[in-house]
Amino acid sequence: MNQPVLVLNANYEPLNICDTRRAIGLILTGKAEMVANGRGYIRTARISYPRPSVIRLEHIVHRPRPRVKLTKREIFRRDNYTCQYCGHQAAHLTIDHIIPRHRGGQHRWDNLVTACAACNRRKGGHLMGEANMHLRRQAVEPAATASYLFGRHASDNEEWRKYIEGW
């Protein structure tokens, strides 16, 4: 009952991920319909319900465009778990402020990069030019596409791909 279910808006735009229990509740109350069933059935004493994988809401839900949250995990994911100074994929990575906070650098997407411990120590509280270091890739906020937001579940749920791609 805790398996993820992709929730689509009435126009098939990917909205969210909920668990199976919530999805079945939405279907039974008539607020959603099942689009894909790839997981068998849930059996009760009297009835068997298909276990949904993708559901579509009956009415359009208007919401603002989502943004990727600025978290350590998302910075690592954006940078592909690679040090942005030396290109090394280390087991223990850190977050580095390109312009150090004590020099007025902000805690924003364009000022944060993944760094290995050695590069972070080497750069310290200096600017990149002072430490004679360069970024391999510019730090930018990742686009909040459906494939980026829901992509980590796509490998386990192949039937989601056709609904996620293109949004």
How should each PLM-predicted stretch be described?
Residues 58-89:
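Glycine-rich adenosyl-nucleotide cofactor-binding module
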Residues 1-67, 133-167:
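Short helix-coil boundary/hinge micro-motifs
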